[in-house]
């Protein structure tokens, strides 16, 4: 049972405004306002809009035939979501926290969330309209890494030492199967977070870490990256060293053959790699324990060549140019498709992997998924860059159908935080053609507002506007979610966003627990839309953000134009707050006009639409009147959002 939360009068007003926006214009009422202690039922949007649904309704019961752009995705790190089995909190490892990695008071250690807990909350996730789950990495990790005083754990899932097993802190392989089957039984998809760039930190370099090393080239200040030019594969130590690996032709695309890599037999071209005693068999599958499958060039600088060949914070960087690594990774992740019937992959550190790897790996995954009866297998890469031109390289050249849309995140943050006018959207959306037809010009890109790396959207807006009230921060955060639901792309909700979480930083600081937290640096955060803290269980289906997401996702689900339709710019303002765009139903030709006021004052506006569109029907907010052919007049409250549908198909777009 979820306790009723006390919220302020202004927060109740915002919630009421959201409900009014969903149904139609708010009208005066003589009824007394409900007390703060009275739980309010969430608006039933599907019922309200049933008469206005497109004739091309989507069958949401069949997750296999549903195309990815029709989904709303919910993302979580399992360790931070729900603890369904406290007996696995230490993963079965003996010793203290530096052995098993469990310390729920420390933001950098395991907290106890697991697959049983996640399975128990599937109806909560589905209730907000999510139809797909992006599951953070669940593989067995090295429990603890880091030097003395800098230790943290692999709770996040990205320090893998067994690519075939579920991390025992999270549960078992059987419990993963139970979770996926339970999601599928609800018509929900599961996208698994995968890593091909690196493994856990096992390999060391004698020049840096071996206390018995006496060589003149002993390193005292970290293992700095050593480049291909200064430390080629064919000499030992540096370019002036003795010849090794005779006949090896390098690792460019046309030399990535088994015959060529068979000549790469000595691996001390840059550093002298070794596996510390006791860790010789630390990784699974067994082939990952062979030093020859890693670059062994030292720490990345995150720039240039080192971003492909360097170790991230000591993590062992896989030689993804090596054909046996390519084949090995293909075999590993085919297994996750076969055994668990995953519906797609989110692919970590995409830009740090050899591009030719993707041209082999991605088609192999699609082909295997189709063979397993998964025709709409959805893969999206992580390329941490807000520049659409940089992102589009991966769809145009490297073979990705989708990449996470960091450009969308940057544009929405700039506008909704007040940094720029709405003309920022012009510059962003004009780049959609760069992505190509594979993404349907951006319509299949996963869009998001914040995540576990960069931090939460609400926290970023607060940092940009330190004096902003909690009520205004809630209104801006709601509006940002509304824009994400109705603009092109596949919306991704980061767990906790729907409960008003406001991180006070990025990475570890933005990975709060949904179940009652014992982490002081989380529990002192001031959440929006509630008086609760992260010290409580935060699965409140009456939270204004949960309700807003549920309401807007219901509208999106009822009208395929809002997921599949072409997006047309209608209005932006330089240094202004108004933004309008249309989505066109690809089957019926109906035009949907979405208008937002991203400002603190009411606005009245005339918006030009297609001359064939007429008699706008209200799906959300107030839709005003047709002033004349092709012009609609609207009034929007502060942070207001309206969604309007033409009653008749446009003559221009009708089929």
Model-derived regions, located:
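Active-site-proximal helices and loops of the catalytic beta/alpha 8
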Residues: 55-56, 180, 184, 198, ...
